[in-house]
């Protein structure tokens, strides 16, 4: 059975995450480090912050594409990532560096712009979720997924990039609801298995003494 969260998601969890992350995005430590390199090599702290708030911005935008285009197939989460060019590309490949460079450029508006994007998206998100249909169109991959699966993808991205931002300025990751983190972690486990194979992912998660190397869902894939 393909991984899906359809019918199981707390659809208010993403909104609560937006509220919980506002202090981090607006933190003076983030402002002071805005143009410095982040915990992600080659990407500025500002770029990471802009990428983080962009997850909420994209949620509002994509949930509002109603109805989804008729030509777009409805796919599973695994198929969504199979269609994603950056997923298996090396971190220094254009598929990944273009994302880094785009968000570094978008961060030129400074911290105040990212704070405003987050505030605006936070205000609009509840209505966007309430009005969403059963599936949501993802223009980047020209396909649709169940709306609950779409929200889990955004939750996972939020969790990962919130940690990136916090680590970049030596702040703790803000507490986020289990309703957001548990589905996000489940998705990351499956994506790790897709990247590295089930045995590698399994051992990294369950048996450190048999772990054969890194099993991150994103990043370099062992040769």
Question: Can you say where each PLM-predicted feature lies in the sequence?
Answer:
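N-terminal interaction modules that seed assembly of large macromolecular complexes
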Residues: 39-52
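Structured surface interface patches that mediate subunit assembly and partner/cofactor docking
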Residues: 2-23, 28-41, 61-92, 98, ...
């Amino acid at each position: 059975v393909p991984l899906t969260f359809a019918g199981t998601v707390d659809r208010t969890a993403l909104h609560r995450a937006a509220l919980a992350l506002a202090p981090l995005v607006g933190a003076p430590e983030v402002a002071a480090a805005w143009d410095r390199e982040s915990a992600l090599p080659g990407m500025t702290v500002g770029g990471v912050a802009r990428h983080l708030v962009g997850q909420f911005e994209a949620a509002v935008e994509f949930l509002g594409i109603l109805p989804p285009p008729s030509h777009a197939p409805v796919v599973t989460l695994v198929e969504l990532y199979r269609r994603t060019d950056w997923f298996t590309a090396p971190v220094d490949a254009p598929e990944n560096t273009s994302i880094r460079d785009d968000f570094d450029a978008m961060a030129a508006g400074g911290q105040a712009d990212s704070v405003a994007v987050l505030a605006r998206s936070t205000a609009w998100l509840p209505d966007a979720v309430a009005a969403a249909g059963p599936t949501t169109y993802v223009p980047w991959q020209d396909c649709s997924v169940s709306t609950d699966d779409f929200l889990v993808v955004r939750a996972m991205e939020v969790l990962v990039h919130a940690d990136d931002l916090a680590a970049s300025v030596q702040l703790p990751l803000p507490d986020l609801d289990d309703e957001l983190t548990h589905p996000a972690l489940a998705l990351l486990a499956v994506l790790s298995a897709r990247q590295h194979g089930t045995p590698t992912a399994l051992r990294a998660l369950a048996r450190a003494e048999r772990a054969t190397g890194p099993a991150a869902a994103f990043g370099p894939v062992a040769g």
